[in-house]
Amino acid sequence: MMWLSWKLFLFLSLIGCLSESVDYGPVFVQEPDDVIFPTDSEEKKVSLNCQAHGSPTPTYRWLRNGTEIDVESDYRYSLIEGSLIISNPNEMKDSGQYQCLTTNMFGSILSREAVLQFAYLGNFSGRTRSAVSVREGQGVVLMCSPPLHSPEIIYSWVFNEFPSFVAEDSRRFISQETGNLYISKVQTSDVGSYICLVKNTVTNARVLSPPTPLTLRNDGVMGEYEPKIEVHFPYTVTAARGTTVKMECFALGNPVPTISWKKVNGHNPSKARLRKSQAVLEIPNVQLEDAGMYECKAENSRGRNVFRGQLQVYTYPQWVEKLNDTELDSGEQLRWECKATGKPRPTYRWLKNGVPLWPQSRIEMINSVLMIRTVNISDAGMYQCLAENKYGTIYASAELKILASAPTFPLNQMRKTIIITKGQEVVIECKPQASPKPTITWKKGDKALRESKRVTILPQGSLRILNASKSDEGRYSCRGVNVFGSAEIVASVSVKEPTRIELTPKKIELTVGESIVLSCKALHDSTLDVTFYWTLNGQPIDFDKEDGHFESIKAQASSADLMIRNILLMHAGRYGCRVQTAADAVSDETELLVRGPPGPPGVVIVEEITDTTATLSWSPGADNHSPISLYNLQARSPFSLGWQTVKTVPDVISGDMESAMAVELNPWVEYEFRVVATNKIGTGDPSAPSRMIRTNEAVPKTPPANVSGRSGRRHELVIAWEPVSEEFQNGEGFGYIVAFRPNGTRGWKEKMVTSSDASKFIYRDESVPPLTPFEVKVGVYNNKGDGPFSPIVVICSAEGEPTAAPIDVKATSLSVSEILVAWKHIKESLGRPQGFEIGYWKDMEQEEAAEKVKTAGNESSLLLTGLEGNTLYHLTVRAYNAAGYGPPSTAVRVATKKSPPSQAPSNVMWIQDGSHVSLGWEPVRPLANESEVMGYKVLLRQEGQSNSQVIETQKTSAVVILPDVGVYIIEVCAVSEGGDGTASPQIRVPSYAGGKVTSAQSTLHMFSTSSSSVTLLLVLMVPSTSW
């Protein structure tokens, strides 16, 4: 009992934790990388990055060399999200291996190890170095003895003074392993001071050693001796796959030895390179196959020396198979396997929640396989598989969830009533969700269900009943039980009579445009409602999207009709009626065949193209259940208005033909063709257009139309025509042949016009008199030859320029700026005028400065405007045509009128009597250079209008009758032969409607334009004829 209570407590706790299906354990997004921190860095801060996802959000802890860091107790440590920040890092306190541990309620995972290393470069000892003295020809080694440093450094040597560096060659070599300078054979030029320079690869810091003097001894020259290998690679060289391997080998000797390399029992890798006068063998991107024994040989005339060493290539572990998150029911068995490759072969360790996992009674670890038998809630957590060899460790993580719950049923299984028909098969689902898997039992009514051949409990717990009958009706209950509890669902089964259906008619043949009604009747259990569904080719008919072609009609509860109106070809197919009840669904189908015009023929192929014909072939399209009776060929060109029917051979293309010849095409024209089929129902859609083709070239057959003459210059024959359309040019190189001859002669002159767009030709001959008749015809040609000529027409050469001057030239001054010029012209036979030109100039000017105005045709007068007033002008008139100008007439003289008076009528007075307005004003006296006053004009217009009524008078008074009700504007101006003078200021006069106005109602008004004062005494004023 206590055991059950404990399990129940764990179960309830876990259910609370797992209530949110989206929760999951930590997953690393970013793990820390190795960091090299320069001790002289200005930032004074190290950041080790770590970030993980999880729900709930994970928390973070950090380990250094396997011990947890207490971030809270040391101010130098801080956490930003998951990253560890170390302020003022110290090599003694902080260098080492770091790991990030991230945790949420589902467990913990441990990151890879990241190494924090400090970069620095110490100083050389300041102690003076002893001189090295050797004999000439002897070999020597100068020691660098570098200071303390981290990480790697680069060596170079300075000779005598910076920056004179020692150049490496076959005689001198600087080892990047020891930093020493090796001179295989010392020469007198080598005497001097040598300084070792080292550079940190991370900080780029440099330091110089104290100088080492090199001197020569006085006891003679060193004799020849065999090579002695002073620099060689280790006996065993290890390298990671993909890195670059550098192996050094250098020897002292006299003469200077030569270095050679080889791979023992194999060939040197093709990618291998020899550096520094062959003293370094470099193998980039080293692979496992590059491993083996390598030999360095130093040789000179005195002998040779050999060194051999082994290159071993290792690989870091790499995953082949990782872990996957797993969910198990309580009591099941877990088997996880992770696989990795590497050289040496990796070994495996397992962690649970960041802590090593050890074998127990239920837990077994064999190499890369973890097995846990009979899992329970305590096994849930985050697991990690570690694959490691001596060169590295990799981590794979996964979450194990243990499901433990009492049985529950999904809502979709809670069907209270199941209605079926006799003979049906029914499955009553019973699939409770539970962990561990529950035991299932069934009851019918109050009794345990007994299985039979018809009634069986399926392996997953559901109940299946075959060939149902009335005896199967009743109440069924399913109960699921496991250690955590139980649950039950109940369903009632009702067995009905099966539904039957009949759809009529069974097969229909109709023609496009006809209509039909399909009837669907159902025989069904009277206790069930029925619903009718209509389909076409298995798809539901959407009555709202069929443009009124379909209508569903339900006349009775057990029947439905489908009306199909104005049938189209697309409506052909299998029509189905489906009857649905709560117990079953049945359907029936009928086929509708629709006859209609043929479908479009297949691809049109164009073959055997000539200049006027093309042979077409096609494949027949659908006949839509009415045999094709004939075909029609259509063509389209850039010159046609859409598609046009073309003539064919044969004239009538019967429905069983699949080729024909299009004839009477135009040569050298691009055509597309299509085919249209017809049957007794009608004509169908056309085929797709064929590829565009061009007919062959041919001699042109269409001459130009409307050949005629045009006006031109003297001695010219101008021949014009309508250009031939490109449609009828029949080929490239199209042009015109212009033929002409004087009327009555025999020989033709021919001229070629090469432009296909040309519409005229001008022939010039100084000996041709004006209006000489010519016979003319225009032919055509192209690259294939000459075509026909147009019919012969007779045209005349250009007429001559006019020879006679106009006579009876008269000029009349009309105003200050207008002169009317009139003339007569003598008729000529060879120089008919097209118009006249009037030249005019002022009396003080030369005729060459004359301004010119032309008439538009054979007119006999012209009004000159825009002239200066009171000015004497000279005028001439001459005729002109296309050939040129005729002689001018004798010049005539005429003066424009003086300017009209510039002074407006003054002291304008008026009396209004109803609609009558009596006006009076003082006379206008013109200046000496102005025209005499001949009379006056009174201008009357309604306010807002532009057209004025003009009243002329010889007197200085007038009576104006206002025509209608409104406000009127009145102005007065003088009239002279020079034109109208300046108008007086406007007078606004209202017009009143009504009866007669007495004298007492009369009003005298005065408007003065002068500066003098005028006083009027009104006693009685009656309008008279004199005012």
Curated annotation (Swiss-Prot):
Q: Entry's InterPro entries? A: FN3_dom (IPR003961), FN3_sf (IPR036116), Ig-like_dom (IPR007110), Ig-like_dom_sf (IPR036179), Ig-like_fold (IPR013783), Ig_I-set (IPR013098), Ig_sub (IPR003599), Ig_sub2 (IPR003598)
Q: Where in the cell is the protein located?
A: Cell membrane
Start and end of every Fibronectin type-III domain?
Answer: 600-698, 703-800, 805-899, 901-994
Q: Which UniProt keywords apply?
A: Cell adhesion, Cell membrane, Disulfide bond, Glycoprotein, GPI-anchor, Immunoglobulin domain, Lipoprotein, Membrane, Repeat, Signal
Renumbered to this chain, the positions carrying a covalent lipid of the kind GPI-anchor amidated serine are S999
Positions of the propeptide segment: 1000-1027
Partners and quaternary state? Interacts with INgCAM/L1 and the tenascin-R TNP protein. Does not interacts with NrCAM.
Briefly, what is this protein's role?
Contactins mediate cell surface interactions during nervous system development. May contribute to the formation of somatotopic maps of cerebellar afferents during the development of the nervous system.
- Protein name (database record): Contactin-5
Instruction: Give the organism the record lists.
Output: Gallus gallus
